[in-house]
Amino acid sequence: MKSKDYVQELNGLTTDKLLDREKELKEQLFNLRFQLATGQLENTASLKQVRKDIARVKTVLRQQELNK
């Protein structure tokens, strides 16, 4: 299952790297939305996947914040 492996990978990252990952994902989401608006996006499921990945990163960041 990809999500469990992805979350385990995220748990091993530092806060700075998680913030960088979040920024990259937000940029990717922006580009996907732009492609959708211009009709160039073929795989619309990628929007949902990127949004979920952003949520996973934010969840791990929040968990780390609460554990401090």
Curated annotation (Swiss-Prot):
An example Gene Ontology CC term for this record: cytosolic large ribosomal subunit
Gene3D superfamilies in the cross-refs: 1.10.287.310
Biological processes, Gene Ontology terms: translation
Domain of life: Bacteria
One Pfam family in the UniProt entry: Ribosomal_L29
SUPFAM superfamilies according to UniProt: Ribosomal protein L29 (L29p) (SSF46561)
Alphabetized UniProt keyword annotations: Ribonucleoprotein, Ribosomal protein
Example GO molecular function: structural constituent of ribosome
PROSITE patterns found in the cross-reference section: RIBOSOMAL_L29
NCBIfam families membership: L29 (TIGR00012)
UniProt similarity note: Belongs to the universal ribosomal protein uL29 family.
HAMAP family: Ribosomal_uL29
Protein name (record): Large ribosomal subunit protein uL29
Species this protein is from: Limosilactobacillus reuteri (strain DSM 20016)
